[in-house]
């Protein structure tokens, strides 16, 4: 029994030494690296608005046209929980969760041959997602730079809202009902457009 405890103590000591070696005095050392500060600066650089797609209207069905959409509110995203630093083959990485509390809105203008025009908008009351970055430290000023690694994975998406402005209350009500009746389709639409817009926002903020 005593030998078993002695072996356990030796194993713990060896493991502690190995961890200390990995996280200090090596390429995987996070000492003095302000990861949370880098994430805060990244969010501050997110664009307020980003127009994506065709600038001119294009036909969708007979008499009905749409054009590219505007993504807004990414600069209001918030970090959710602590950043998780780790290493893969000596490369410093960080995993970060973000939360969107309805501040990100995707808006697409539309118009009809009857003269009606308005916007189609999509938002999620609450969404949480996680992504990963490479971390590189400058040897000159010891500052760090993040590089988007991806992928971005949605974790939680709640209450996706579809609004149709300019077509009257009935059209807006129908859009809301369809969003509730077909939640899987609505979520897929949101995930595709949101994650693509987020990827663009990340690249713009980091470049």
Regions inferred by a protein language model and the residue ranges of each:
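A broad, structure-centric signal for solvent-exposed, well-ordered loop/edge residues
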Residues: 8, 73, 78, 162, ...
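Extended amphipathic ligand-handling, pore-lining, and cofactor/metal-binding catalytic surfaces
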Residues: 138-203
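A short glycine/threonine-centered beta-strand motif
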Residues: 131-133
């Amino acid at each position: 029994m005593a030998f078993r405890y002695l072996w356990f103590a030796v194993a713990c000591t060896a493991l502690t030494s190995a961890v200390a070696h990995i996280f200090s005095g090596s390429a995987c050392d996070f000492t003095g690296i302000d990861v949370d500060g880098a994430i805060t600066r990244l969010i501050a650089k997110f664009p307020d608005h980003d127009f994506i797609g065709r600038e001119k209207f294009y036909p969708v069905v007979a008499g009905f046209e749409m054009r590219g959409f505007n993504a807004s509110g990414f600069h209001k995203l918030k970090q959710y929980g602590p950043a998780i630093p780790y290493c893969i083959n000596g490369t410093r990485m960080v995993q970060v969760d973000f939360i969107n509390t309805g501040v990100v809105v995707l808006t697409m203008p539309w118009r009809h041959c009857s003269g009606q025009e308005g916007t189609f908008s999509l938002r999620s009351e609450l969404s949480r997602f996680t992504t990963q970055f490479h971390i590189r430290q400058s040897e000159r000023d010891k500052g760090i730079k993040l590089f988007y690694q991806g992928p971005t994975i949605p974790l939680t998406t709640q209450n996706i809202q579809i609004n149709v402005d300019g077509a009257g209350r009935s059209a807006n009500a129908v859009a809301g009902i369809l969003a509730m009746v077909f939640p899987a389709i609505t979520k897929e639409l949101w995930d595709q457009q949101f994650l693509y817009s987020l990827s663009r926002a990340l690249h713009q903020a980091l470049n």
